[in-house]
Amino acid sequence: MRDKKRLTARSGFLATIVLFIALQTGCASIRGQQYHHFSTPTPIEENQTLILGFLGGRENWNESSRGVRQLAMKIDSMNLPDVHIETLENRKRDLAMELILNSFDSNQDGYLDERERGSARLIMFGHSLGGAAVVKVSNNLNNLNIPVLLTVQIDSVGFTYDDHVIPPNVKRAANLFQLDGWLLVGEDEIFAQDPNKTRIIANVKFDYTEKEIDMSGVPWKRRLLSVPHSKMDADPEVWSTVEKLILSEIGDTKLGILAEERVVDPGPDPRG
């Protein structure tokens, strides 16, 4: 019933959504992102972590004004040992799969064996359509028995896709969202398909009814249809939260994860 209501509510906006996406296309190249744009050498070493960030809308993978790209560049500038980070266009999920498989295929035989799958260290995050792409790629990886350490969805918009259901290959998942937009709002809650295997570490709501966000760097076409959705992409607090989640996962526990009052207690951690 919940999914039916969700689909019915959103289906009426399809024409407007098409316009929204068209407006965001801007000067994006026709071909878009290609594999040679990645800088990560493959395969990566067994103890190394691969982080993938998916941009929203029709933005290019290297659009420096978007929060996903800005955070990726910030983490990359930290020169963290054993960490590789890339950003992707949300529609380039096949490209993401190719990079993931090449990264963890240590013997480069075109197949991830049990040892290679077990040692894979993958983190994914994404905003808007990029948040939904994170779940879609996670499901594809689940079909191959490839684990994901952490997924973070930021105002995830899947339209007809069930991006609120997290597959069991994901160990930990977090969701940041707003409900103030008239057209584009994120998933208000994500759920583990198997709570015994996936821990939902946060469902965090951001309120933009009165919160002031500097939108001077946001093009008018992105503000036209959903100001709160665009505000979330430009909100430093949002990306500080995502950064802490990611750095905590790769071992920088000094930063913590989230303010205690914002964490949803999902029960025992599958890590034991």
Residue ranges and their predicted role:
Residues 15-24:
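Bacterial N-terminal signal peptides
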Residues 82-83, 100-191:
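Serine-dependent carboxylesterase/thioesterase catalytic core
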Residues 1-9:
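N-terminal secretory signal peptides that target proteins for export/translocation
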Residues 168-272:
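C-terminal catalytic-base region of ester-bond hydrolases, centering on the histidine
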